[in-house]
Amino acid sequence: MIIRSPEPEVKIVVDRDPVKTSFEEWARPGHFSRTLAKGPDTTTWIWNLHADAHDFDSHTGDLEEISRKVFSAHFGQLSIIFLWLSGMYFHGARFSNYEAWLSDPTHIGPSAQVVWPIVGQEILNGDVGGGFRGIQITSGFFQLWRASGITSELQLYCTAIGALIFAALMLFAGWFHYHKAAPKLAWFQDVESMLNHHLAGLLGLGSLSWAGHQIHVSLPINQFLDAGVDPKEIPLPHEFILNRDLLAQLYPSFAEGATPFFTLNWSKYAEFLTFRGGLDPVTGGLWLTDIAHHHLAIAILFLIAGHMYRTNWGIGHGLKDILEAHKGPFTGQGHKGLYEILTTSWHAQLSLNLAMLGSTTIVVAHHMYSMPPYPYLATDYGTQLSLFTHHMWIGGFLIVGAAAHAAIFMVRDYDPTTRYNDLLDRVLRHRDAIISHLNWVCIFLGFHSFGLYIHNDTMSALGRPQDMFSDTAIQLQPIFAQWVQNIHATAPGVTAPGATTSTSLTWGGGELVAVGGKVALLPIPLGTADFLVHHIHAFTIHVTVLILLKGVLFARSSRLIPDKANLGFRFPCDGPGRGGTCQVSAWDHVFLGLFWMYNAISVVIFHFSWKMQSDVWGTISDQGVVTHITGGNFAQSSITINGWLRDFLWAQASQVIQSYGSSLSAYGLFFLGAHFVWAFSLMFLFSGRGYWQELIESIVWAHNKLKVAPATQPRALSIIQGRAVGVTHYLLGGIATTWAFFLARIIAVG
C-alpha cells in the first residue's frame, strides 16, 4: 500500500486590482519596454516594437505576470474569433442567397458577397443561379448552416448579434482577469483541475449540447428539407424543442421520452442515433443521424475523462505520478521532470499543443473530402478544394510553430543542470545520431523519388514508353496502400460485423454516390502515379522535419557554437571575427523550415487537386457513365515532371490566365499581384544588409542637401528582419497565387 501525504486543498486564489487600467500608458508606444518607451532614434525602433509587443518573456521575468498576460491575450483572441464569426453570419444574413440556395442546392451556387459598382467592378458579380448575381463563396458556411438547421436569414442575423455580444463579453473578460481579478500562478499550474474542466466542460458538455441540438433541431429540420418542404413552412427550432409531439411525428420513439434511457432500452433510440456508415444519397454528406450518435458517444467519453484526475477529493490520477511512472527498460528516468517543465514553461506546453493541433488539422483536411460531414458539401467542388487546401496550410504552419516554440523553450526555459538521464536529456545526448540518420533518409528519399520521375522524363523524351514506370509498362503499385484500402472496404460484415457500409467510399467497394448528376464520392484507385508522388511527400516532409528538429536539438549548443544558448533564440552570427557562424540560430531553422513546409504542402494540394479532378469529380449520365473533369489523365500524365508542368500547372492555369473580362477576373488580378508579392520577397532574401545601408546613406545625403532630413535616422533592416520580411512575402505570395489558380480553375469547370 502506498502511503501519501494528504493532498493540499485546491483554493481558487486571485489578486484583486493588480494592474491599474491606464489609457495614457497604452497610448505610449513601447510602454512595455524601457528602451522602446524612450521613442525612436532610428527606424529600427518600429521593427523592434512589432517584434517585442507580444514577446511577454521580454517584458518581465515573472512567470505569474507572463501567465496572466497570456491568459488575458487568449480572451482577446476569442473576441476576434467571435467578431469574425459574427461577420460571416452577418454576410449570410445581409448579402447572401442562402434561402434560395437552401431551396435548390444542386443548381444554385452559394454567394454571400455582392460587389458594389464603384469603379466598374460589378463585373465580378457572376450568375450563381436562381437569378442571383454575386461572388461565389467556397467556405462551406452554407452547408454548415443547413446541417445546423438554420432555415432563414433572420436566424443568421440573430446568431450574428449573439456572436457580437460574446465578442464584447470576451473583451471584458480579458480586461477583468488582468486588471480586476488576476489568477495567481498556482491556478495556472493546477493541471488536474484544468484537465477535468476542459475535458468535462468544453469537450464533454460541448459535444453533449451539440448532440442535443442536432437531435432536437437539426435532424427534424433536415428531414423536412430533404423531403422538399419549403423552408418557410418548416416549424421554427424552438417549436421542436418545446413540443415533443412534433418530433414524435418524425421519430415515433420520441413519444416515450426519457423512459427507454432509464430502463436501459436504448435500442428504442436507433431511429435517430444510427450507425449506418457511408453517405446519404440525397445530400452526399454523412448521415446526420450518424453524426448525432457520434457526438453523443464522444460526449460520454469526455465526461468520463473529465472525472479522472485527482483534485480536492483525493481520488483519481495525479499527472506527476503518471509521468514519473512512465519509464521503460531502455529509457533511463523516462518522463521524470516533465511535469515541472510543462508547468513552468508555457513554450514547452505550447509546442506540444501546436504539434498535436497541427497534426489534427491535417487529419481534418483528409476527412473533409473522404467523409464529407455536411449536406451538399461533396458536390461543391470549389468548397471541397478550398477546405482541403486551407486545412493543409494551417496544419503546416502550426507544426512549424511547434518547432519554433520547442526551440524557444530550449533556449529560454531549459535548465540542463536539473535534467539528467530523462528522455529529453537522452535525446539531446544522441542528437548527432538522430540528425545524421535523418539527413541520410532525406538524401535517399530525394534522389530516389526524384530519380523515378527523371527516369520517366528521359524515357518519355527518347520515345520509349515501354521502359517507363507506369500502370501500363513497369508497374510500381502501392501494394500496402491498396491492402489498407481493401481491409477497410471489406470490413463491414467481416471485421466490423455491426457496420452496414465502410467508413468512406474512397476505400473501394464499387458503389458511387452522385447528387444532382454530379459525383459526390467514389472509390479512389491508387496506382504507380500515386506511388511516385507519395515518395515526394515523404521526401519533403522528412526534410522539413530535419530542419526543424536540428533547430530544436542544437538550439542551446553545437560543435560550431558551444555557447549558443547565451546568444538567444534569434541572432545573425556569432559576433564579428567568427566567419561561417551566420544563420545558425534557432530562429533561422524556423525560417528555413517554413520554406520546406511550403514545398511539402504545395505538392500535397497539387496532388489532391489533380487527382480529384481526374479520378473522382465529374458528371454522371442517365446511363450511369461517369465523365471526370480531366478525364482520368492523372495516372499517365503525372508520372513525369513534364506532365506536371504541362497537364497540371499550364493546362489548368488557362482559366485564371484567361479570366479577364469575366466574373473570375479578380482571380486573374490576384494571380498577377500575388506573383509580384512573391517576386518582391526575393529582393529581401537575395541581397545583404550592407547593400541597403549604402543606398540609404546616399538617399540621406540627398535629403540633407534639400534640408528635409528626418529626425529619426533611417537604418537598413537587420539581417533577421530582412529574412522575416522575405519569408513572409514568399509565403503570402505563393499561397495567394495558388489560391487564385485553384479557385478560378475549379469555379470555371466544377
Curated annotation (Swiss-Prot):
GO molecular function, one term: magnesium ion binding
Main localization (coarse): plastid
Binding site for chlorophyll a': H675
Keywords assigned by UniProt, alphabetized: 4Fe-4S, Chlorophyll, Chloroplast, Chromophore, Electron transport, Iron, Iron-sulfur, Magnesium, Membrane, Metal-binding, Oxidoreductase, Photosynthesis, Photosystem I, Plastid, Thylakoid, Transmembrane, Transmembrane helix, Transport
Record's GO cellular component terms: chloroplast thylakoid membrane; photosystem I
Membrane topology summary: Multi-pass membrane protein
Catalytic activity, EC: 1.97.1.12
Binding site for chlorophyll a: M683, Y691
UniProt keyword Ubl conjugation present: no
GO biological process, one term: photosynthesis
InterPro entries: PSI_PsaA, PSI_PsaA/B, PSI_PsaA/B_CS, PSI_PsaA/B_sf
Residues given in the record as phylloquinone binding sites: W692
Catalysed transformations (reactions): reduced [plastocyanin] + hnu + oxidized [2Fe-2S]-[ferredoxin] = oxidized [plastocyanin] + reduced [2Fe-2S]-[ferredoxin]
Described purpose of this protein according to its UniProt entry: PsaA and PsaB bind P700, the primary electron donor of photosystem I (PSI), as well as the electron acceptors A0, A1 and FX. PSI is a plastocyanin-ferredoxin oxidoreductase, converting photonic excitation into a charge separation, which transfers an electron from the donor P700 chlorophyll pair to the spectroscopically characterized acceptors A0, A1, FX, FA and FB in turn. Oxidized P700 is reduced on the lumenal side of the thylakoid membrane by plastocyanin.
Assembly description: The PsaA/B heterodimer binds the P700 chlorophyll special pair and subsequent electron acceptors. PSI consists of a core antenna complex that captures photons, and an electron transfer chain that converts photonic excitation into a charge separation. The eukaryotic PSI reaction center is composed of at least 11 subunits.
NCBIfam families to which the protein is assigned, alphabetical: psaA (TIGR01335)
Name the record gives this protein: Photosystem I P700 chlorophyll a apoprotein A1
